[in-house]
Amino acid sequence: MKEKHWIIREDYDLETVEKLAASLGVDRIIATLLVERGVTTFEEARRFFRPGLDQVHDPFLMKGMKEAIARINEAIEKQERIMVYGDYDVDGTSAVALVYSYFKDLDRTIDFYIPDREREGYGISYQGIDYAKETGVKLVIALDCGIKATEEVQYAKQSGIDFIIGDHHLPGDEVPQAVAVLDPKQADCPYPYKELSGCGIGFKIVEAHLERKMGVRLCDLPEQLDEVRRARQEELKLKLLKYLDLVAVSIASDIVPIMGENRVLAFFGLRVLNTKPRPGIEAILKYGHVDRRKADAADQTDTAEKPKTGYFEKELTITDLVFLVGPRINAAGRIRSAFDSVRLMLTEDVNIARHLADDINNYNMERKELDTAATEEAKRRIEKDPFYRGRHSLVLYDPGWHRGVVGIVASRIVEAYYKPTIVFTKGSDDLITGSARSINEFDVHEALEKCADLLEHFGGHRCAAGVSLKQENMKAFVERFERLVQESSGGKEAVPEVEVDAELGFSQITPKFLRILKQFAPFGPENNVPVFVTRELVDTGNARVVGTNHLKLSAIPIAERTAPYPAIAFQMGEYISRVRKGERFDLCYQLEENYWRGKTEIQLNVKDIRFCE
């Protein structure tokens, strides 16, 4: 295992921490965690701990929203056929399900379309546009894709089909000539929050349309409204709340920041999931051993913002969505057809949901077999082929690898070697297609921009991107990409880092501390589960290796008279002999609730272990 560099965060003002701790009546560590997340005043802390739907931004601040809603209303008035188009991953399919279900509720003649990963690839395809033309579609709402589809949108325009683009990926130099392009990452877009998911963009379209229809805004403060408008706003909240479960699934699965507006949307989305989940999500969760409470059925929502929860035996978190829901929904688009994922999220029939969930879970098991085999082969090549020795990047190609798993394989290679990685396989139209995954220190999208002359298509984010190129350009691309990575690191090998929020003694882990810490949720990028360091620990003598090389131990401080805490250290079984010998160690960990057989206990999720000299 590659040695990690621990970085104790000190990027905060001590005076600000002390003032915040005093005003909130909390200890210094809690105040430090807040300041590290940009929460520096009592009012900011109130909004952080008590998210409200009035904290979302006015959707009409987004460039193009006014034009988008006008064109949608025109289509409704003229009874034109609308098609919702989306990417085949969780973000895209949840966005399609959200927008499609909203307009379907309005009794609109509407269709949806997801491109086939193998035949059409990522983004807006000519086949999809041809399908729209054949079925009489006049307006396409594209979600989680399209920001670079200039030629495809022009092709549709020639066929009398208008496009509304709703994307969150980085734009290129040229923006499609659509009726409206909704993407907060456009340089001239004044929308205050830039990190919405693709499904989040879809939600803002629905929010904007419903606000215009009802004559009240979600972001209006209730105390500033008269009684009639306040009642109308409560109705608006209830109408919109039912879509936020899909937004939460997309936020978790697409690994977007969970601060600002995303945190509000995820917070209420989780409330919906924990109160009255849609049949498809509940059916999928059964495969993660998350079951409905046996004693009592789901409580109904009392108000839009204060529902009674407790539908499942355990409270669903972002982590459950990341590991239990997202991979399964993704598997349909990776292995078979993402249409199944959309149908799963749309159906209100419990039996149909169960059948679809069965199929999707089978796809996921097949996906696991494929990505495990490809990952093992990729690692074997890296270890045995002299070409990879001393390289700062890893680019691998095998025409036999399944297109649906190359992104997962790239992620696993980054985890193992901590180097920017691109995994390629055979694509369509005689192209090589692949997925790039990066490390914290390297912007892979920026690097691909510097290789654009060698590429046919690329798009994505700082840490993940899709790319395709011609076979004859592969060698030149590999060498240029390697050079860019070397230049970025100054020729030094990147070292994985663990960012530590604070040092913590076990005696400081009080019920009040844990209660407040839990209120930091939902967790995710920019609001990660806090990482702590506790020093000078030993095991109580019951350490063992469980599962596939996971170290299970019970840690107790040498200097403190406190009870031990159970700890799990994934993929760290090689440390078992030293722990059993009674060697002292420092632990870098996250505090988490471990739910097992109806019981919940606090355990340490170990990020790294360092033995004392």
Question: Where are the regions that the model predicts?
Answer:
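Divalent metal-coordination and catalytic microenvironments
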Residues: 34, 87-89, 141, 167, ...
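N-terminal small/polar loop signature for handling phosphorylated ligands or for N-terminal nucleophile
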Residues: 63-176, 181-187, 373, 377, ...
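Functional cores that coordinate and move charged inorganic groups
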Residues: 134-137, 145, 150-334, 338-344, ...
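Short glycine-cluster motifs
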Residues: 422-438
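Acidic, two-metal ion nucleic-acid-processing modules in DNA metabolism proteins
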Residues: 99, 104, 109-110, 263-327, ...
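Gly-rich Lys/Arg/Thr-decorated short loops/hinges at beta-loop-alpha junctions or inter-strand turns
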Residues: 45-56, 80, 105-114, 184, ...
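Flexible, glycine/threonine-enriched loop-and-boundary segments that flank and lead into catalytic domains
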Residues: 384-411
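Cofactor-/ligand-binding subdomain signature composed of acidic, glycine-rich
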Residues: 1-78, 324-362
